[in-house]
């Protein structure tokens, strides 16, 4: 990556933009986002060079790269974009990615995004934003392929070809009647069927879905359990309102695991990345638990002081104290690691507190 950074830096300074364009056009969007992160404020001191590189990307690749960037870079670029460039990014972006961007941006940036959105896009954005932050509705997309049960396989393929280019996924299609979800069918099922077969005869009617207000952590658990590529989201009347895709579910799982690690390490969860969190925020996330641990250490010291006479009589006992305390700390670290792993794999829940305590305090038949 560093060699690529240096090469692009050199070519831009030499104004060999065509060569730069040929280099970046074949790169993966996620890799380009990492590249821009390295460039942001480091290799390029000039904002114009940063913008030149972004403008050399093809429109579709630029939009996908933009979606992978962190909020600081996105805000920086939007403030430098013309209205046409914002419009181009929105045209190539999925609605759920646009919503993610809006949620991270300051008010002045949000107003520019909404100003350059179409009426349909604003309606879709507002529809997702009205759901609670940690709900399934807040992470779904409304860009899915909907089929009718009376369609034939050939008609279904015709519709997929017609509307699929603007959908986030076309592998899993959803069969609806009066907006109500009645079946699910995959492209594989369609390929394996005859052209004249009816969708109603080959669709899967045993549907696993999630309510719009369900906690997004539950959505992550369902993806982990059922290996979904996409999960339908329905309202209380079983009307299909959107889908959660695999990439968004993975973000939820990563956030959940980060939160679990923070809690087990006695640190208040923080949504910002490590290097984008200031020293005062780092201190704020730790100070409460540090005070609690300090109080517990004080209690330990009080107990130790009560046996001061014993230590005076047998000084050798003092030499064992650091060893015993370190061993206890190491044992606690090992136990917390196992607990974190169990939580991450959904083997342990907070309701299992007493069950875990019993496991550590009593012998098990499995030990024999």
Predicted regions and their residues:
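Single conserved hydrophobic/aromatic residue that forms the stacking wall/gate
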Residues: 360-368
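Alpha-helical membrane and juxtamembrane elements of multi-pass inner-membrane transport
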Residues: 87, 123, 133, 200, ...
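Non-transmembrane, extramembrane segments of multi-pass ion/lipid transporters
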Residues: 248-282, 333-358
């Amino acid at each position: 990556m560093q060699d690529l950074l240096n090469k692009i830096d050199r070519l831009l300074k030499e104004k060999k933009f065509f060569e730069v364009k040929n280099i970046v056009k074949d790169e993966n969007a996620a890799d380009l986002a990492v590249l821009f992160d390295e460039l942001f404020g480091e290799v390029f001191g000039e904002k114009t060079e940063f913008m030149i590189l972004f403008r050399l990307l093809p429109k579709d690749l630029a939009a996908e790269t933009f979606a992978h960037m962190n909020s600081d870079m996105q805000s920086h670029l939007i403030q430098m974009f013309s209205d046409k460039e914002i419009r181009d990014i929105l045209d190539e972006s999925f609605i759920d990615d646009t919503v993610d961007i809006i949620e991270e941006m300051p008010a002045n940036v949000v107003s520019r995004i909404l100003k350059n959105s179409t009426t349909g896009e604003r309606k879709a954005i507002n529809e997702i934003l009205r759901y609670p932050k940690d709900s399934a509705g807040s992470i779904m997309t409304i860009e899915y392929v909907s089929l009718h049960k009376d369609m034939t396989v050939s008609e279904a393929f015709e519709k997929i070809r017609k509307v699929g280019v603007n959908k986030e996924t076309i592998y899993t299609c959803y069969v609806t009647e009066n907006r109500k979800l009645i079946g699910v069918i995959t492209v594989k099922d369609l390929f394996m069927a005859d052209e004249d077969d009816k969708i109603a005869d080959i669709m899967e009617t045993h549907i696993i879905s999630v309510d719009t207000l369900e906690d997004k952590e539950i959505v992550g658990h369902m993806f982990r359990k059922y290996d979904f590529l996409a999960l339908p989201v329905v309202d209380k009347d079983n009307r299909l309102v959107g889908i959660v895709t695999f990439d968004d579910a993975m973000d939820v799982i990563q956030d959940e695991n980060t939160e679990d690690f923070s809690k087990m390490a006695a640190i208040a969860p923080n949504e910002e990345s490590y290097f984008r969190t200031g020293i005062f925020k780092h201190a704020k996330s730790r100070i409460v638990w540090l005070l609690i641990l300090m109080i517990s250490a004080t209690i330990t010291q009080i107990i130790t002081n009560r046996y001061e006479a014993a230590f005076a009589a047998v000084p050798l006992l003092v030499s064992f104290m650091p060893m015993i305390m370190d061993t206890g700390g190491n044992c606690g670290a090992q136990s917390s690691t196992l607990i974190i792993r169990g939580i991450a794999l959904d083997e342990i829940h907070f309701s299992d507190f007493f069950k875990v305590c019993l496991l550590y305090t009593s012998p098990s038949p499995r030990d024999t």
